[in-house]
Amino acid sequence: MTNQTQLSSKTYDTHFAKLTAEQLAENAKKKVIIGMSGGVDSSVSAFILQQQGYQVEGLFMKNWEEDDDTDYCTAAADLADAQAVADKLGMKLHKINFAAEYWDNVFEHFLNEYKAGRTPNPDILCNKEIKFKAFLEYAAEDLGADYIATGHYVRRSGDDNNAQLLRGLDANKDQSYFLYTLSHKQVGQSLFPVGDIEKPIVRQIAEDLGLATAKKKDSTGICFIGERKFKDFLARYLPAQPGEIRTVGGKVVGRHDGLMYHTLGQRKGLGIGGVKGLSEDPFYVVEKDLINNVLVVAQGHDNSALLSSGLIATQLHWVDRQPIRENLRCTVKTRYRQTDIACEIQPIDDDTIRVIFDDPQIAVTPGQSAVFYQGEVCLGGGVIEEQLK
C-alpha cells in the first residue's frame, strides 16, 4: 500500500515522466525512509517519492545536543517544519537521536584534526558515519526499509547491486563532493529524488504544494555549528595559542589568535595593515608552522608560495571499492564548488596516492578532501595529507 498524496504540482508533472501502471505497482512494493531535515530539498524529495508510488515514511535525525545558544540551534524549528511537511503529505515521521554517534564518530575527529593544524570537512564525515551508516542501518533493520532517500543533489546509475554515483544535474548544487565515501552498495540502497532537477524547480514544486519549507533558506555552515560564529564555537572546545604572523622571508607582520582559525589561501581576517618596506598587495596564508606556532603569509594571489603541483592523499574511498593499481587520468576537486582540475593519479599503495595536476593550483589544504571524477561519474576520493610544491 502506498501513501500517495492527493496533492499535485504542475511543475512536477512538467519535469517528471509519468510512470506506467506496472512501474507504480512495482514501486508500491518498496518502502522508502527519507531523511527529513526540515529543509525544502528533503520535503520535495518526499513528495516525488510518493508520486512515484513508493511507500514513504520520514525520519528526522537529531545529531547535536543543544546548549545555551538558543539563538543558533535550529533543531526544534527544523523538526517542526519536517512535521508540518509530513502532515501535509500524509506521511508518518519517525524521530531518532544520533547525537552520541555524532560526537564519537564525527565531532571528536573534527576537533582532533584542528588540533593537528588541519582543516577537516565534517559534512563528509557526517554523511559517511551518520546519514549513510547509522541512518541506513536503522532504516533497514528497525523500520524495514528497502531504500533510504535524501535531498542531496546527486544521481545514481546502474542497478541496485552495481550502482554508480553521478554528479547532480544542477551543477551549481551538485553535492557528490560530500558523498564520495559511499560504496556502490550504499549508493544502490539510496534514492536521490532531486538529483535530476535544478534547485529553482524544487522550490517551485514546494510552492505549488504550499509546503511550509517552500521559502526556507538553505542552511549554511557546518551542521553542528549552524549560523553561529565559527571562531566563537571552536574556542569553547580548543584552547587557542596566539602567535606571530611572518612573511616567507621571516619578517614579522602581525599576530594571530590561533593557527586553527586560519586556512591555506585565506586572505580576509588576517588583520595585517600596511607594512613598511612591503607593497600594498594583499597577504595570503601559505603555511601553518605548528612547531613554532607561526602563521606564514605571502603577498599576491599568484604568489608561487601559494601554488601546488599536486598532492598526496590517504584514507581513500573508491565507490567501487577497488583500489587503483595503475596511473589514471581523471579530474579532481580539492574543495567544494571548485572547477574540475585535470590530473593524473599515481598509486603509491592501496591507501595512498600521489596526484599531479596539469596546471599548478592554489590553496590545496591538508585535511580537506580530494574527490575524483571521470565525466559525470564520481570515482571516490581521499583526504589531502600534504601538498606538493
Swiss-Prot record:
Its EC number is 2.8.1.13. Residues 121-123 are annotated as: Interaction with target base in tRNA. It is an enzyme of class 2 (transferase). ATP binds at residues 35-42, 61, 151. The active site is at residues 126, 223. It catalyses: S-sulfanyl-L-cysteinyl-[protein] + uridine(34) in tRNA + AH2 + ATP = 2-thiouridine(34) in tRNA + L-cysteinyl-[protein] + A + AMP + diphosphate + H(+). CDD domains: MnmA_TRMU-like. The record marks 152, 368 as: Interaction with tRNA. GO terms for molecular function: ATP binding; tRNA binding; tRNA-uridine 2-sulfurtransferase activity. The keyword Cytoplasm applies. GO terms for biological process: tRNA wobble position uridine thiolation. Keywords: ATP-binding, Cytoplasm, Disulfide bond, Nucleotide-binding, RNA-binding, Transferase, tRNA processing, tRNA-binding. Its main location: cytoplasm. It is found in: Cytoplasm. Disulfide bonds join 126-223. InterPro entries: MnmA-like, MnmA-like_C, MnmA-like_central, MnmA-like_central_sf, Rossmann-like_a/b/a_fold. One of its GO terms (cellular component) is cytoplasm. Residues 173-175, 335-336 are annotated as: Interaction with tRNA. NCBIfam families: PRK00143.1, trmU. HAMAP family: tRNA_thiouridyl_MnmA (MF_00144). Catalyzes the 2-thiolation of uridine at the wobble position (U34) of tRNA, leading to the formation of s(2)U34. Belongs to the MnmA/TRMU family. This is tRNA-specific 2-thiouridylase MnmA.
